[in-house]
């Protein structure tokens, strides 16, 4: 195995000869052997690709970086964005809490790759310096938070939202398809008055719609970038106008509406935007957990449960019980939601730990955020494709449950009063008879009036 010698301010370090990273990356590799290698999310590396390219363009426009260096840095960044350098980012999230070592990993790779693109060889002195050129007008303290926002925004907008919208549309379509299917309702897990299966599914569609609105409402805060604040938010060592220009380039390169942060001291010292947006992801997870639970309970059986809906049978459910099929998509969804709840606890805690001018829990915060955003999107697509689109009413079971429910007696309240209606229900329950039989036996309602007043289809309100 061949090595070359790289240097930093602490001295010489051996680096694998064919790798573009240099001394600081290698030190981090050796000092933080914690968990799987290269666990820094790819989305963060991609975000740095946009960021470093934008910085090179802004620095050139403002007269502090020559055109040749700008173009070489941009070429190397384009290779990062094209996933051509994925094996050059070996660092873990368990490193310095500011993300300094990953920032330097990108700086070193861009500098060395730019040198090679210019005809040089690894190990030679590069015309592009990782600090003086690639990191010009920047600090890890403003670049890593900026990369966090870019990565989080892109993941939510390009993945999470479209995937949740897909499932929401399916529930809305099912609500319309099932609008005339009258069934018994349940509160406290006990029988209640009727509603339609369409009305029940309309609640699921509405929950996801509100969750999507909440998520989208957090995006303006998330779109604010810290870049230009440098070390503590003052913008030290940046040319005038740099913060506005560099973010304009990021917006151009990503085709997303990023803006410079209103207050860069807040943008470095706190990550409330990440906490806020993940809170909306938690809200969606809460809704999805409730929906998945409802669906697996409504589908329970096939003969000894509620069994009012039929869900797709995707795979055998047991290694010992022949013919058993389980609500596996519901179970996967609830596990994903549980993971999001755990991630939210981590994010909320580390979000509270910004001391003075900097929060130093950045890598773990963004890793948890990106996992939540990815998992929720993936789970919604999986649930939609393998469960939701195939849900159908179990008409015989719905009819049986509806006719057996004692809570249809509620329709008699306005005619004979609550206490008399309760007497009918309790007597029917005790004797194992029907409401109609006991209403007539007790002399409280005639057969004709019972048939006129107790009509489940008239108890569900508007079907529109």
From Swiss-Prot:
Active site feature: 188 (proton donor/acceptor), 318
PROSITE patterns recorded: FUMARATE_LYASES
GO molecular function, one term: fumarate hydratase activity
GO biological process per UniProt: fumarate metabolic process; malate metabolic process; tricarboxylic acid cycle
Pathway where this protein functions: Carbohydrate metabolism; tricarboxylic acid cycle; (S)-malate from fumarate: step 1/1
InterPro entries xrefs: Fum_hydII (IPR005677), Fumarase/histidase_N (IPR024083), Fumarase_C_C (IPR018951), Fumarate_lyase_CS (IPR020557), Fumarate_lyase_fam (IPR000362), Fumarate_lyase_N (IPR022761), L-Aspartase-like (IPR008948)
Reaction equation(s) it catalyzes: (S)-malate = fumarate + H2O
Subcellular location: Cytoplasm
Gene Ontology CC: cytoplasm
Keywords assigned by UniProt, alphabetized: Cytoplasm, Lyase, Tricarboxylic acid cycle
Residues marked Important for catalytic activity (site): 331
Record keyword Transmembrane helix present: no
Residues noted as binding substrate in the record, renumbered to the chain: 98-100, 129-132, 139-141, 187, 319, 324-326
Pfam families, sorted: FumaraseC_C, Lyase_1
Known EC number: 4.2.1.2
Entry annotated with the keyword Cell wall biogenesis/degradation: no
Quaternary structure, from the entry: Homotetramer.
PANTHER family: ASPARTATEAMMONIA/ARGININOSUCCINATE/ADENYLOSUCCINATE LYASE, FUMARATE HYDRATASE, MITOCHONDRIAL
Role according to the record: Involved in the TCA cycle. Catalyzes the stereospecific interconversion of fumarate to L-malate.
Family according to the record: Belongs to the class-II fumarase/aspartase family. Fumarase subfamily.
Note: There are 2 substrate-binding sites: the catalytic A site, and the non-catalytic B site that may play a role in the transfer of substrate or product between the active site and the solvent. Alternatively, the B site may bind allosteric effectors.
Protein name as catalogued: Fumarate hydratase class II
Originating species: Haemophilus influenzae (strain ATCC 51907 / DSM 11121 / KW20 / Rd)
Lineage start: Bacteria, Pseudomonadati, Pseudomonadota, Gammaproteobacteria, Pasteurellales
């Amino acid at each position: 195995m061949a090595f070359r010698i790289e240097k930093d301010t602490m001295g010489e370090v051996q680096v694998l000869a064919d790798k573009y990273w240099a001394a600081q990356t290698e030190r981090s590799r050796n000092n933080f052997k914690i968990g799987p290698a290269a666990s820094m999310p790819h989305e963060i590396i991609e975000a740095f690709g946009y960021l470093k390219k934008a910085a090179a363009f802004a620095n050139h426009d403002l007269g502090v970086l020559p055109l040749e260096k700008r173009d070489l840095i941009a070429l190397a960044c384009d290779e990062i964005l094209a996933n051509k350098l994925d094996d050059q980012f070996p660092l873990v999230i368990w490193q310095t809490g500011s993300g300094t070592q990953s920032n330097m990993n990108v700086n070193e790779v861009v500098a060395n790759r730019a040198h090679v693109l210019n005809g040089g060889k690894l190990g030679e002195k590069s015309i592009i310096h990782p600090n003086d050129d690639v990191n010009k007008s920047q600090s890890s303290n403003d670049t890593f938070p900026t990369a966090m926002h870019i990565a989080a925004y892109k993941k939510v907008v390009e993945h999470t939202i479209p995937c949740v919208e897909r499932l929401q549309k399916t529930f809305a379509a099912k609500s319309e398809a099932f609008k005339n299917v009258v069934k018994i309702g349940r509160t406290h897990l006990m029988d209640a008055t009727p509603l339609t299966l369409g009305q029940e599914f309309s609640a699921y569609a509405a929950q996801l719609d509100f969750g999507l609105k909440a998520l989208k409402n957090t995006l303006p805060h998330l779109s604010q970038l810290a870049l230009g604040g440098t070390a503590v938010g003052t913008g030290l060592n940046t040319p005038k106008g740099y913060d506005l220009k560099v973010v304009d380039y990021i917006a151009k390169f990503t085709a997303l509406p990023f803006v410079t942060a209103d207050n860069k001291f807040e943008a470095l010292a706190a990550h409330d935007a990440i906490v806020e947006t993940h809170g909306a992801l938690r809200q969606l997870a809460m809704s999805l957990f409730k929906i998945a639970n409802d669906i697996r309970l409504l589908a329970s059986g096939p003969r000894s449960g509620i069994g009012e809906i039929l869900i797709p049978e995707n795979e055998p459910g047991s290694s010992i019980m022949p013919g058993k099929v389980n609500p596996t998509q519901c179970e996967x969804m609830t596990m994903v939601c549980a993971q999001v709840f755990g991630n939210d606890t981590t994010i909320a805690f580390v979000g509270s730990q910004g001391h003075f001018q900097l929060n130093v829990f950045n890598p773990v915060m963004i890793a948890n955020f990106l996992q939540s955003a990815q998992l929720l999107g993936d789970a919604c697509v999986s649930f939609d494709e393998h469960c939701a689109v195939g849900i159908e009413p179990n008409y015989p079971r719905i009819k049986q449950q509806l006719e057996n429910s004692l809570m249809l007696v509620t329709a008699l309240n306005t005619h004979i009063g609550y206490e008399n209606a309760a007497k009918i229900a309790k007597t029917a329950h005790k004797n194992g008879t029907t409401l109609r039989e006991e209403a007539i036996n007790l002399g409280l309602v005639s057969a004709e009036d019972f048939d006129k007043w107790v009509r489940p289809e008239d108890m569900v309100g508007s079907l529109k």
